[in-house]
């Protein structure tokens, strides 16, 4: 009579096989167990897969955001985040978002000095929220701000639906009307105007140019000082005055000046402040954002649907519970990463035939 041996399913951090079975007579497969080492069994089921790189996809069972504004054609995410004319559309809500613009990108209205602020992070900050909307009202009256009255500057590289010249909807380029003189630092309070308890993302900045242009626009060709403060974070800037080479953005007009753009996050009910001199870009429409969207670095376009979004492999469908290969951030219904392949023995343990006893 054959003895029956039962191998229990064992999972340990040191094991690279999972095994279960009973005695049998043939053994084309070898598995490794925690208690008995290598064991011959008659059949196994692979539990791991090694994915190949593929396109990213929409995550099954949830809304996935690729571009901030899918219907804003020929617009970068920075265009949308700054509310460039012709790039103002609805940002759909999403539980998951793809971070796809990993390098600094430009915005067509005006040459931006990316290296002086964290503005390149603004699209990704917005992408991390589930719900994002642009306010319908301006946060301050820029024309009557301290140091005014101001006229609001525009750029021929920023045409909108009604004019051949415009500017970002999130900022007002404050150019003195009559009082083109130097000024001591001025302060404007930025109220909280979001209505649903959201975070308020307020965009602001300043313009600088060569000395002759600064004198013509503002009456002061010296470097100007700027400070923003909100939610316990204070940032200081001094404008850079110099002869910048003419630069054309997105097929627009050559620009001799540059703008520095920054943002501050205001929590519900909290007021921010901006201290400024000449050349300020005062905040106008603000972003109201709430909820959290899981963010993963990927590439566009999003094609089809997938169970899992993996930073290295793209969209994955969970065909097996484990995977090998590159370990990276993943979101969704994802297989578990393991270092070496796992197998489940569904056959029986091999036992060599017993030797015949000599008759006496």
Curated annotation (Swiss-Prot):
<keyword id="KW-0946">Virion</keyword>
<dbReference type="InterPro" id="IPR013828">
    <property type="entry name" value="Hemagglutn_HA1_a/b_dom_sf"/>
</dbReference>
<keyword id="KW-0348">Hemagglutinin</keyword>
<dbReference type="InterPro" id="IPR008980">
    <property type="entry name" value="Capsid_hemagglutn"/>
</dbReference>
<feature type="glycosylation site" description="N-linked (GlcNAc...) asparagine; by host">
    <location>
        <position position="160"/>
    </location>
</feature>
<feature type="glycosylation site" description="N-linked (GlcNAc...) asparagine; by host">
    <location>
        <position position="317"/>
    </location>
</feature>
<keyword id="KW-1043">Host membrane</keyword>
<keyword id="KW-0261">Viral envelope protein</keyword>
<feature type="glycosylation site" description="N-linked (GlcNAc...) asparagine; by host">
    <location>
        <position position="246"/>
    </location>
</feature>
<keyword id="KW-0812">Transmembrane</keyword>
<feature type="glycosylation site" description="N-linked (GlcNAc...) asparagine; by host">
    <location>
        <position position="179"/>
    </location>
</feature>
<keyword id="KW-0472">Membrane</keyword>
<keyword id="KW-1161">Viral attachment to host cell</keyword>
<dbReference type="GO" id="GO:0039654">
    <property type="term" value="P:fusion of virus membrane with host endosome membrane"/>
</dbReference>
<feature type="glycosylation site" description="N-linked (GlcNAc...) asparagine; by host">
    <location>
        <position position="40"/>
    </location>
</feature>
<dbReference type="GO" id="GO:0019031">
    <property type="term" value="C:viral envelope"/>
</dbReference>
<keyword id="KW-1160">Virus entry into host cell</keyword>
<keyword id="KW-1162">Viral penetration into host cytoplasm</keyword>
<keyword id="KW-0325">Glycoprotein</keyword>
<dbReference type="InterPro" id="IPR001364">
    <property type="entry name" value="Hemagglutn_influenz_A/B"/>
</dbReference>
<dbReference type="GO" id="GO:0019062">
    <property type="term" value="P:virion attachment to host cell"/>
</dbReference>
<dbReference type="GO" id="GO:0046718">
    <property type="term" value="P:symbiont entry into host cell"/>
</dbReference>
<dbReference type="GO" id="GO:0019064">
    <property type="term" value="P:fusion of virus membrane with host plasma membrane"/>
</dbReference>
<keyword id="KW-1015">Disulfide bond</keyword>
<keyword id="KW-0449">Lipoprotein</keyword>
<comment type="function">
    <text>Binds to sialic acid-containing receptors on the cell surface, bringing about the attachment of the virus particle to the cell. Plays a major role in the determination of host range restriction and virulence. Class I viral fusion protein. Responsible for penetration of the virus into the cell cytoplasm by mediating the fusion of the membrane of the endocytosed virus particle with the endosomal membrane. Low pH in endosomes induce an irreversible conformational change in HA2, releasing the fusion hydrophobic peptide. Several trimers are required to form a competent fusion pore.</text>
</comment>
<feature type="signal peptide">
    <location>
        <begin position="1"/>
        <end position="15"/>
    </location>
</feature>
<keyword id="KW-1032">Host cell membrane</keyword>
<keyword id="KW-0945">Host-virus interaction</keyword>
<feature type="glycosylation site" description="N-linked (GlcNAc...) asparagine; by host">
    <location>
        <position position="74"/>
    </location>
</feature>
<comment type="subunit">
    <text>Homotrimer of disulfide-linked HA1-HA2.</text>
</comment>
<feature type="glycosylation site" description="N-linked (GlcNAc...) asparagine; by host">
    <location>
        <position position="346"/>
    </location>
</feature>
<keyword id="KW-0564">Palmitate</keyword>
<keyword id="KW-1170">Fusion of virus membrane with host endosomal membrane</keyword>
<comment type="similarity">
    <text>Belongs to the influenza viruses hemagglutinin family.</text>
</comment>
<dbReference type="GO" id="GO:0020002">
    <property type="term" value="C:host cell plasma membrane"/>
</dbReference>
<dbReference type="GO" id="GO:0055036">
    <property type="term" value="C:virion membrane"/>
</dbReference>
<protein>
    <recommendedName>
        <fullName>Hemagglutinin</fullName>
    </recommendedName>
</protein>
<keyword id="KW-1168">Fusion of virus membrane with host membrane</keyword>
<dbReference type="Pfam" id="PF00509">
    <property type="entry name" value="Hemagglutinin"/>
</dbReference>
<dbReference type="GO" id="GO:0046789">
    <property type="term" value="F:host cell surface receptor binding"/>
</dbReference>
<keyword id="KW-0732">Signal</keyword>
């Amino acid at each position: 009579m054959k003895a029956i041996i039962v191998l229990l399913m064992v999972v340990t951090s040191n094991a690279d096989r999972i095994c279960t079975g009973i005695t049998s007579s043939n053994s084309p497969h070898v598995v490794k167990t925690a208690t008995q080492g290598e064991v011959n069994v008659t059949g196994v089921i692979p539990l791991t897969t090694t994915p190949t790189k593929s396109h990213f996809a929409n995550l099954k069972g949830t809304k996935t955001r690729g571009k901030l504004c899918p219907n804003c054609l020929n617009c970068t995410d920075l265009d949308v985040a700054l509310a460039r004319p012709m790039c103002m559309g609805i940002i759909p809500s999403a539980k998951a978002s793809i971070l796809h613009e990993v390098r600094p990108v430009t915005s067509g209205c005006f040459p931006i000095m990316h290296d002086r602020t964290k503005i390149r992070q603004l699209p990704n900050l917005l992408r991390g929220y589930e719900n994002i909307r642009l306010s319908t009202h301006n946060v301050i009256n820029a024309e009557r701000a301290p140091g005014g009255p101001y006229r609001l500057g525009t750029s021929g590289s920023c045409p909108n639906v009604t004019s051949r010249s415009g500017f970002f909807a999130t900022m007002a380029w404050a150019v003195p009307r009559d009082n083109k003189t130097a000024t001591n630092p001025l302060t404007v309070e930025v109220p909280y105007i979001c209505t649903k308890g959201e975070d308020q993302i307020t965009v602001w900045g300043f313009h600088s140019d060569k000395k002759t242009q600064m004198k013509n626009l503002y009456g002061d060709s010296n470097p100007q000082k700027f400070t923003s403060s909100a939610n316990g974070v204070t940032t200081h800037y001094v404008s850079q005055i110099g002869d910048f080479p003419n630069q054309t953005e997105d097929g627009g007009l050559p620009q001799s000046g540059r703008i520095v753009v920054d943002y501050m996050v205001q929590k519900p009910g909290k007021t921010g402040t901006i201290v400024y001199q000449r050349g300020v870009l005062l905040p106008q429409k603000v972003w109201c954002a709430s909820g959290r969207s899981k963010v993963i670095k990927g590439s566009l376009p999003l094609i089809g649907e997938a169970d899992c979004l993996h930073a290295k492999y793209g969209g994955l469908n969970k065909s097996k519970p484990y995977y090998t290969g590159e370990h990276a951030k993943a979101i969704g219904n994802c297989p578990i990463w393991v270092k070496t392949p796992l197998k489940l023995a569904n056959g029986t343990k091999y036992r060599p035939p017993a030797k015949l006893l000599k008759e006496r």
